[in-house]
Amino acid sequence: MKKLFVLNGGAAVKPGNKSAFLKIDDPLSSFSRGGINTGDVLVYDAMLKALAYDQIKNLQFAHAGDEKLWPQEDYDATVIRGSNYLTETVDISNVIPLLKKLKGPIVPVGVGAQAAKYKKLELPKGSVEAWKIIADKCETIGVRGVYSAEVFNDIGIKNVRIIGCPSFYRNLRPSIEIRPIDPAKARVGLTLNRYLSADYASNATKTNRMQRALIQAVAQRPVNRLYSQGEREETLAIFAKGEEKQKHIQSILEKYNLDGDKDVEALVSDRMQAFFDVDEWAADAKENVDVLVGFRLHGNVIGLHQGIPAVFFTYDSRIRELSTLFAIPSVEVEDYMPINLENIFEKADFSKVQHVYRLNYAEYHRFLTENGLNHVLANPVTAPPKKALEKPNLVQTDQNLGEVTDWFQDEVGYMTGEIQTLRDRAWKLELALRELKAPKPNAKLAS
C-alpha cells in the first residue's frame, strides 16, 4: 500500500483519492465567518489526479505545531500543496519541527512568490530555514515561474524546477487544444477579486477600476456568468434569500461603485455561481462558457486546462508570472485602457499556448518522476523547454480615440470626487480633534 502525507492540502478528498472538495453543509454559516479560496482546492484536486497513492493523510500548516496530529507511521512521500508561500508576511517556522521529523522526500508542488511587483523579497528567517530543510529533502522544488525561482536563489536554494501550477495539468494530457472564440457571441465567464490592496497589486486603484469596467462589459451579455471563487459577499449573495440576499448584492455593487447599474445587478443576482466541488466547477465551465476573463488565477485555469480560452488581467507578480510561463494572452492593468471585450477576444493570440503547454507538461512530468512520486501522467510528446518563458503575451488592442477620451474623462471625474471625499473626511477629523483638545468650560470653573 502506497501512502502519501500532504501538507496544507486544504480540502476533503473523495473516495478513490482523485478529487478534492470543500465539505460545507451550511454555506451561509461558513461564509459568514469569511471567504474560502476555492482556487486552492483546484490545485489540490489537480495534484490528487496526477498522483497515485492508496492512503492519503493531510495536515494543515496552521496545525503543524501540534505533535498529536503528526503521522505516527512512515509515509512513502510527503508533498506540499503549492501556494503563495514566498511572501514577506508568510512565516512557516511553526512547521520546522515536523519537517525535521518526517522521513522520506518532502516535495513542494507549485510554490510561488507573491508581491505587487517583481522585487527582491525579505522572507521571514523562519521561512528561510524551513525551505532549506525542505530543499535538502527533495531532488527539486517545483516552482511557479522564473520570479519564484529567483526568490529561492536569493536565499541560496538552487534545486528548483519551473513547472507552473499543477492545476494547469489537471486533465493529465500531454497536450491541449484551445477552442476558437467567436468574439461577438462568446459566452463569457468572469471571476473577481474584491480584496486587492497595495500589498498584492502594483496599483490597487487601477486594478479595482479595471475590475469595475470588466464587470460592466461582461454584464451587457445576458448569457454571461460570474463565478465566485470563494469570495465572502459573493457566496453569501448566492445562497442567501430575500432581504439578506439583497443586502449582499448591494454590498457588491457599492464596492465597485455600480449601485443602480441594472445589468450588473442582474448578473450578480441571477447569473452568479459558486462551487465547492472542483469536478462540478469544471463541468459547469465546460458546458456554459466559451471564454474566461478576470482577476482570479484559478478562475481562468478551471477553463484553460480543458481547452477553454482565457484572458488574464495581470496586476501582481503571481498572475504575471504564470500567464507569462504559459504564453496566455493578458491585459496589463497598468496600461489602464477602456475595455472592449470583442476587441480583446479578436486580438488575443493563443497560437503559442498549445506549444508551450506541451513543453511545460514535459517539465512537470520530469519533476514528478525525478522526485520519486508515484504518478499517472502520460509520457510527454516533446522535450522540456530549454528555458522558461519570461516575456508576457500582451493583448494589443486598437483603441478608438473617442472611447479613450470618454474613458479618461469619466475616470478623472471619479478620482476627483474621491479626492474631495478624502478632503471632507480629513476636515471632519481635524474638527473633531480640535474639539477634543479644546479646554472644557466646566474644567475652567473647577480650577
Give short role names for the model-derived ranges.
Residues 1-447:
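Active-site anion-handling motifs in enzyme catalytic cores
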